[in-house]
Amino acid sequence: MSRPFSSGVYVSRGVALLLAALTAVLLLVLVALASLYGSCAHVQPSEQGNSRVKNTSLWPPGGQEWALPTPAQEPTVGTSQDLGPPSGPWDHLRLPPWLVPLHYDLELWPWLQPDKLSPPNLTFTGRVNITVRCTVASSRLLLHSFLLNYKQVEVWGPLAQDTRNATVGRVQVEKVWFAPDMQFVVLDLGQSLEPGSRYELSFHFSGQVLQVGLEGLFLNLYHDEDELRALVATQMEPTFARHVFPCFDEPALKATFNITVIHHPGYAALSNMPQLGQSERIDVNGSRWTVTTFHTTPRMPTYLVALVVCDLDHISRTERGKEIRVWARKDDIANGYLDFAANITGPIFSFLEDLFNISYRLPKTDIVALPIFASGAMENWGLLIFDESSLLLEPEDELTEKRAMILSIIAHEVGHQWFGNLVTMSWWNNIWLNEGFASYFELELTNYFYPKVPMNMIFFFTVLHGILGEDHALESRAVSTAVENFTETSEINRLFDLYTYKKGACMAWMLASFLSPHLFINALKSYLETFSYSNAEQDDLWRHIQMVIVPFRHFLAEH
C-alpha cells in the first residue's frame, strides 16, 4: 500500500495564536464552572460561631443561591445527580455507623385550629434534642431529613458522665447542607467527635402537614355532628419519620423518646405513652396553646413514633389493670359503632400475654379510627391507628363473618405489639418476621374466638393456595432477601406485599405444623424474651427453633 497524500486546512500563524488563546480561555471557564459544580444544597451558619441557620435560602458548595420554595411547592433543591456531588457517605442509602442514638426529646407543634380547618399551607414546627454516642471519630454527621427547613442547629458535648444533659463543651457547626436524593441532612463540624463520648444534637425545624398524601404528619378533613372537622395524625412506617423530624430513621437504631405535643386547647393529643402533664404556652400573636407531655417510651425505632391531635370522642375499657381507649367520630361513638372493637381488644391482648407468658409492656393502649387512612391499619406502640371502615360495626349487626373480620384486623395489629414492637427486624429485608407472624396469629385468634368460622379452610384456600399460585410466577421472591436489594424507600415499600404477609404466614403455619404447636410457641417465647427491646434477623429465629428441637430430640432418643 502506498503512503496516502496529506490533506487538511492551513491557517496563518496569527490565526493559530488566536485559536490557542481562545482555547486557553475556554479551559479556564470550564475549570471555574467545575469549581461551582456542587453536590447538594447547604446552609451556612454565621461567621461568629453562632449555630443559627438561615432558613431563607439553600446554598450549594460554590455559593450559588436558590430561593426556598413556598410551603405548598416542591423544593427546587438540585438533586445529587444534577449537581454532581463529591464522593462521600451521603452517596449511600444507609447511615454510616458513626453515631448511635440513645434518646430523643421531641417537641412538635402542628398549627391546627378549629376555626382554620383548611388553610392553604398547614405547617408544623418542632424541636428535637438527640442524645447520641460517638463510635467513630468524625467531623461530619449524617441524619435522615426530608423536606424539613432548619432554623437552628447545635451540637453540645461531650456530655458529662452519668448524666444526660450536663455538658462540658460545645462543638462548632460550620456548615449544614442537604443530600436530598438520599434524604440526609449533613453537619460539617469544626472538630471531630470523640469515640466513646456522648453528645446532644439540637435542631429547630419546620415542615408541612400533608393534605394530600397520608404519610409523615398528615391532615384528615371530615364531617361529624353535621360540622366540618379536622385532625392531624402520623404514619411513619417505613421511612417517613424523617419527614417529621431529623432522626436516625433505621429500624435497628432504637432509642427512648420523650414526646411533647403543642396543640389547640380544643383538641386532645395522643401519643405512644400516657399523658404526663399539661401546661400552657402563648404564641407571638397572644393565642393560647396547650402543651401536653408524655411519659418516656421504651426503646423503639423511629417508625413507631406516633401522635394524633383531634377532637374525636372515645370509650374506655380496662383489661388486667390497663386502660384501652377507642377513639372515633362523636356520632359513631354515640351510636355504639365502636363497642365491639372496644370489647374485643382487651381479650386479644390477654390471649397473647398468656400464650407467650410475656406481658404487654406499655401501661395503656389507644386505638384511633381515622376517617381516612390509606395504610389501613398501623401498629404504633401504644397508639394503634385504623381506617374507621375496619372497625365500625352496627350493634344490631349479628353477622359472625363481619365480627370475625374486625377481630382479625385488630388481632393483626395487636400481634405486632410483640412481633415488630417488642422485637424488631434489623432491616426491612426481614419484614416478614413482623408481618408473617402477625398474620399467622390473626388466624389463631380468630379461630379461638370464633371456632365455628372455618378459618383453617379459609386460610388453606385463600392464603396457602393463593401464594402457591403466585410462587410459580416469574416475579416471585423469597420472604427474606439480601439487605442491599432493599435500601431505597420505594424498594422498601414494595416489600409490603403478599409474599411478606401471606407467604410469611404460611411459613409460620408450616413451622407450627411440623414442630408441633407446643415446641413452636416455646421457640417463639425464647426468641421474644432474648430480643426484647432489640432487633433480630431471620437466622436468630432459626437458632431459637433449633434450641427447642435439640432437647426434644434427645428426649425422644432416651425414651
From Swiss-Prot:
The Enzyme Commission number assigned here is 3.4.11.-
Residues involved in Zn(2+) binding: H412, H416, E435
**The record's account of how the chain is modified after translation:** N-glycosylated.
Glycosylation sites per record: N121, N129, N258, N285, N343
Textual note on the cofactor: Binds 1 zinc ion per subunit.
A single Gene Ontology CC annotation of this entry is:
membrane
Q: How is its activity regulated?
A: Inhibited by bestatin.
Protein localization = Membrane
Residue ranges, Cytoplasmic side: 1-13
Keywords for the protein's UniProt record, in alphabetical order: Glycoprotein, Hydrolase, Membrane, Metal-binding, Metalloprotease, Protease, Signal-anchor, Transmembrane, Transmembrane helix, Zinc
Q: Which GO terms describe its biological process?
A: proteolysis
Task: List, alphabetically, the InterPro entries matched.
Answer: Aminopeptidase_N-like_N, Aminopeptidase_N-like_N_sf, M1_APN-typ, Peptidase_M1, Peptidase_M1_aminopeptidases, Peptidase_M1_dom, Peptidase_M4/M1_CTD_sf
- Where substrate is bound, by residue? E237, G376, A377, M378, E379, N380
Q: Where is the active site?
A: E413
* Metal-binding listed as a keyword: yes
A GO term for molecular function: metallopeptidase activity
| UniProt enzyme class | hydrolase
Lumenal compartment spans: 35-559
TM segment ranges: 14-34
Fill in the subunit field for this protein: Homodimer.
Q: What does this protein do?
A: Metalloprotease which may be important for placentation by regulating biological activity of key peptides at the embryo-maternal interface. On synthetic substrates it shows a marked preference for Leu-4-methylcoumaryl-7-amide (Leu-MCA) over Met-MCA, Arg-LCA and Lys-LCA. Cleaves the N-terminal amino acid of several peptides such as angiotensin-3, kisspeptin-10 and endokinin C.
Family that this chain belongs to = Belongs to the peptidase M1 family.
Tell me the protein's name.
Aminopeptidase Q
**What is the scientific name of the source organism?**
Mus musculus
